[in-house]
Amino acid sequence: MNQPFEVKLEEHWLRDTYVDLLLEYAQKDDRIVALDADLMAASSVKRFSQQMPGRAIDVGVAEANMIGVAAGLAAMGKIPFTHSFTAFASRRVCDQVTLSVAYAGLNVKMVGSDPGITAELNGGTHMSMEDVSIMRNIPGMTVYEPVDSAQLRAAFPQILAHDGPVYIRLLRRPAVRIDSENDEFTLGKASLLREGGDVTILATGIMVAEALLAAEELAGQGIGAEVLNVHTVKPFDEEAVLRSAMKTGAVVTAENASVIGGLGSAAAECLGENCPVPLRRVGVRDCFGEVGLTDYLKEKFGLTAKEIVRAAHEVTERKNFR
């Protein structure tokens, strides 16, 4: 399990994997429909609309209306998949998602693409750091972020089978390959990627690769880091997190999102109530995004392996002085 980790980008863009899966399952299940808000080219849903024109709807720049239409389709037995950038798929439609979908208990799957800093040149207005927090606070919502194409393929049938709203936080570009096809994937259950006895690193999305790089560096310093891919932030896998925290006695979280209300908060809530251990949250700290390429923004907001290593040293030192 603790094999050397090498950063390799997938050839396939994650958005294309998503549309491949939509097409594959839509051919077998006529309940599946796709909705977009004037971003069909950006999401690759245009390809779905060309092959299945009667089952794709572009509502225009009207995201809240898109959620209302999706709720109506779900009420009639369809399984709608909606898409917009995370900023518009979460904060702009929050009331409609809360009332029209979640309160009504409807089976709508919502895709938010370009999560966190990966919005890059679209800048702060399109860069949602708070979407995980928003969606995690809506009753009955499942919040999932695939780490790579292989994991998304494993997750898709489970997302379809889940009777209820799901928010999928989707990187549009090629993901770093984590070899997650070797995992036994279960929605709502964290994946153990690396074993260690000194510190637990909980990561999600693009930060999983950073966590594995950090674990390699820490190993060279004599610190054994256990790495869990918490792909489903809600429901939160308390069992796996507590098992690891009790083993290591120190925890670091890493997320491409605000530390307020997201993975870091979920871990703090779980550990605070069940297993108080030193915790350090790596993520965006109460600020808006800005224009820049991903590598620059990683450094700007501290979303790096270097920052995870620093956090790991901090919590292990605190553990040793308790």
UniProtKB/Swiss-Prot annotation:
Q: What class of enzyme is it?
A: transferase
Q: What is its EC number?
A: 2.2.1.15
* GO MF terms, alphabetically ordered: transferase activity
Concerning SUPFAM superfamilies, the annotation shows: Thiamin diphosphate-binding fold (THDP-binding) (SSF52518), TK C-terminal domain-like (SSF52922)
Alphabetically sorted, this entry's keywords are: Carbohydrate metabolism, Thiamine pyrophosphate, Transferase
Catalytic activity annotation = 6-deoxy-6-sulfo-D-fructose + D-glyceraldehyde 3-phosphate = 4-deoxy-4-sulfo-D-erythrose + D-xylulose 5-phosphate; 4-deoxy-4-sulfo-D-erythrulose + D-glyceraldehyde 3-phosphate = sulfoacetaldehyde + D-xylulose 5-phosphate
Q: Which cofactor does it need?
A: thiamine diphosphate
InterPro entries, from UniProt? PDH/Transketolase (IPR051157), THDP-binding (IPR029061), Transketo_C/PFOR_II (IPR009014), Transketolase-like_Pyr-bd (IPR005475), Transketolase_C (IPR033248)
Superkingdom classification of source = Bacteria
Quote the function comment for this protein: Part of the sulfo-TK pathway, a D-sulfoquinovose degradation pathway that produces 2-hydroxyethane-1-sulfonate (isethionate). Catalyzes two steps of the pathway: the formation of 4-deoxy-4-sulfoerythrose (SE) and xylulose 5-phosphate from 6-deoxy-6-sulfo-D-fructose (SF) and glyceraldehyde 3-phosphate, and the formation of sulfoacetaldehyde (SA) and xylulose 5-phosphate from 4-deoxy-4-sulfo-D-erythrulose (SEu) and glyceraldehyde 3-phosphate.
Similarity-based family: Belongs to the transketolase family.
Q: How does it assemble?
A: Forms a complex with SqwG.
What protein am I looking at? 6-deoxy-6-sulfo-D-fructose transketolase subunit SqwH
